Amino acid sequence: MSSLSAYRQGHSFQKSMKIFMSGLEASGEFWDITKLVPKFKYILCSFYYLKDDIFQEIKRKSDLLIIDSGAHSFQKGKKVDWVEYTKKYADWIEKNDSPQIVGYFEMDVDNLIGYEKVLELRKILEAKSNKIIPVWHKNRGIEDFKKMCQDYSGKVIAITGFKNEDIKDEQYLMFVKYAKKYSCKVH
């Protein structure tokens, strides 16, 4: 059963799920697309690919935005100064934050630098915004997921779903139900 099917079994879709379109900012046809599409609803952008003029156009045409750190883009062999990149991302967040932006994903690169370092990077981001979205990974353990829901009660959290490596589709409902207990919205 897919995560969508599991979610449907336990929840009504009326006003409960927003689907964010992604990849627009990295498209070579961005300006052509924006000429054809007068309004976007929900957009997820990667900080890694964002250029200021493209961001301003997406922001102008969108109801809501979520910004990804772009950390996953680096997992293809590039050497990165994670602290420097995070500071640059944090400064961009401070400069560009608006009510229209739902949140900003943390630097969830546990597999590269370890969870303790990720927590240090999260502090850099949280010093600039209270809309940082923590991303739970299996290596963090179930107790960390529960603590994350409690600590971020009423906010947006994320559960990694990349290639079903961390949790299986049929397990998502259990995570979503637990997060809902703390009024967390789940990406």
What are these regions (language model features)?
Residues W92-G103, L121-N130, D151-Y152, Y178-C184:
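A structural motif corresponding to the C-terminal end of an alpha-helix
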Residues M1-L4, Y152:
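Extended hydrophobic/Leu-rich segments
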Residues K131-H187:
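Glycine/Thr-rich beta-alpha phosphate-binding loop at enzyme active sites
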Residues S3-E120:
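Non-catalytic, usually N-terminal nucleic-acid engagement modules in DNA/RNA processing proteins
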Residues Y49-I58, N111-K123, R140-D144, N164-K177:
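Active-site-adjacent beta->alpha loops and helix N-cap segments on the catalytic face
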